[in-house]
Curated annotation (Swiss-Prot):
Belongs to the type III secretion exporter family. Keywords: Bacterial flagellum biogenesis, Bacterial flagellum protein export, Cell inner membrane, Cell membrane, Membrane, Protein transport, Transmembrane, Transmembrane helix, Transport. Residues 53-73, 116-144, 211-382 are cytoplasmic. The lineage of its organism: Bacteria, Pseudomonadati, Pseudomonadota, Gammaproteobacteria, Enterobacterales. It comes from Escherichia coli (strain K12). InterPro entries: FlhB, T3SS_substrate_exporter, T3SS_substrate_exporter_C. The gene is flhB. Residues 1-31, 166-189 are periplasmic. The chain crosses the membrane at residues 32-52, 74-94, 95-115, 145-165, 190-210. This is Flagellar biosynthetic protein FlhB.
Length: 382
């Protein structure tokens, strides 16, 4: 039993995932962020490399141009430096903006947007060096190390192959004008970066899968955890059973309180009792105010006798009413004729009690459709 509760072999429930999300525990892939940043850099160089090269060449020329008129004036020197910095910022603004935007958006692509203050709260347990030492030799750390080694080998191989293949072209840059050389250099850098991106895409895909798998594995639950969560979110089954029992008892008390209002109680002496009420000025059809089987039926009869409610033994009708009529609801239309005969007998019985004479004969052979009777079914004793 203890082994079952200790082994976290079950997938996390939606509630567990949502709770972890609220605590800031979501899958993250640094490799995905790096890839997107690299893509932004490649795009800027590929589509705006010539413009960037020209602006950087202009800055380089301006920085290497010495004007004797400003050498002895510190204010002019400072102004020149500020101008160069501004030109550099404007030249690199597309690249910087793209990198910042990707750095903000890329984490949302995998784990979604989460604002959690719990991850910012200080945890003094992190000051304990033992967990840190354990993490250094964990499988997660080993996987990260292996991934870093493979990434270094892959990027180094792609870059080395590119430099070897384009070495003559790179050497010719020294013979070109600065602006032309800068533009061609940007093209080479963009092509090299594009090859690196294509090379690391499979690794990034594997890393995304690995991070999601590791996240779900870390949130795995034992069967006992799932049972405890069910008790907390849905309620303890024993408590829920007790609540349902109390609700049934309260409903039964309300039902018994309505028995004295009934006009007649129809009985199957062996099992069932159904109390009916009809007010021709307020109701379009008779309704059931109480019904029960077994001990409940016996209690309905006792309350009816204490309040002088007429009773009629009509087993088929009692069974049909018990099965097909609900408490507080009107009786089914198929039973109108049978109940009408019963109510007519009740009206005659009231007149007899007031005026005397010959006692009315109880109706027999009431017209109850066979489809509504269930004579062979055993009742549930409530």
């Amino acid at each position: 039993m203890s082994d079952e509760s200790d082994d976290k072999t079950e997938a996390p429930t939606p509630h567990r995932l949502e709770k972890a999300r609220e605590e800031g525990q979501i899958p993250r892939s640094r490799e995905l962020t790096s890839l997107l940043i690299l893509l932004v850099g490649v795009s800027v160089i590929w589509f705006g490399g010539v413009s960037l090269a020209r602006r950087l060449s202009g800055m380089l020329s301006a920085g290497l141009h010495f004007d004797h008129s400003i050498i002895n004036d510190p204010n002019l020197i400072l102004g020149q430096i500020i101008l160069l910095i501004r030109e550099a910022m404007l030249a690199l603004l597309p690249l910087i903006s793209g990198v910042v935007l990707v750095a903000l958006i890329s984490p949302v692509m995998l784990g979604g947007l989460v604002f959690s203050g719990k991850s910012l709260q200080p945890k003094f347990s992190k000051l304990n060096p033992l967990p840190g030492i354990k993490r250094m030799f964990s499988a997660q750390t080993g996987a990260e190390l292996l991934k870093a080694i493979l990434k270094t080998i892959l990027v180094g191989s792609v870059t080395g192959f590119f430099l070897w293949h384009h070495w003559p072209q790179m050497m010719r840059l020294m013979a070109e004008s600065p602006i032309t050389a800068m533009g061609n250099a940007m093209d080479l850098v963009g092509l090299c970066a594009l090859l690196v991106v294509l090379g690391v895409i499979p690794m990034v895909g594997f890393d995304v899968f690995f991070q999601i798998f590791s996240h779900l594995k870390k949130l795995r639950m034992s069967r006992q955890d799932i049972r405890d969560e069910f008790k907390q979110s849905e309620g303890d089954p024993h408590v829920k059973g007790r609540i349902r029992q109390m609700q049934r008892a309260a409903a039964r008390r309300r039902m018994m309180a309505d028995v004295p209002k009934a006009d007649v109680i129809v009985n199957n002496p062996t099992h069932y009792s159904v109390a009916l009420q009809y007010d021709e000025n307020k109701m379009s059809a008779p309704k059931v105010v109480a019904k029960g089987a077994g001990l409940v039926a016996l209690r309905i009869r006792e309350i009816g006798a204490e309040n002088n409610v007429p009773t009629l033994e009509a087993p088929p009708l009692a069974r049909a009413l018990y099965r097909h009529a609900e408490i507080g609801q009107q009786i089914p239309g198929q039973l109108y004729a049978a109940v009408a005969e019963v109510l007519a007998w009740v009206w005659q019985l009231k007149r007899w009690r007031l005026a005397g004479g010959q006692r009315p004969v109880q109706p027999t052979h009431l017209p109850v459709p066979e489809a509504l009777d269930f004579i062979n079914e055993k009742p549930t004793h409530e």
